[in-house]
């Protein structure tokens, strides 16, 4: 009586088919993953700026002083990061409340129509350096997607976010 011992394992053909299927699934998943990561960074950056704007407004009301939310480096704009600073009566920096570094290489923060900074007076309203009312937005563009988000300041100085699925006909920041 001859005993046959069955050997377990995969054949080369089965292994190649499995690897091919995994490669196809990875090729489909990677672009979606990149888009997901970029959109997450976009949402995170806009939420952080909105939170900092709300905190700056609250600090201005609480301390009865002017509080400014401005880019870290004025020449490069909001893409370099931003800081929240309390100003004294002469307009000099009194105290830095918060400072944020750039969040991602994929994001472009631009098309700012608030004059390069957000200035809250002691009543919590947005004003420019001469005391005139300002409203507007700071636009965020994600590099790998067509999605646009903006921080929009309303007439009372309250910040809100707006997201548009397309850079064309974006109603967020016109």
Would you name each region that the model predicts?
Residues 1-10:
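N-terminal leader/signal peptides at the extreme start of proteins
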Residues 2-3, 24, 28-47, 51-58, ...:
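N-terminal helix-rich module
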Residues 9-31:
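Short, contiguous hydrophobic alpha-helices characteristic of membrane insertion segments
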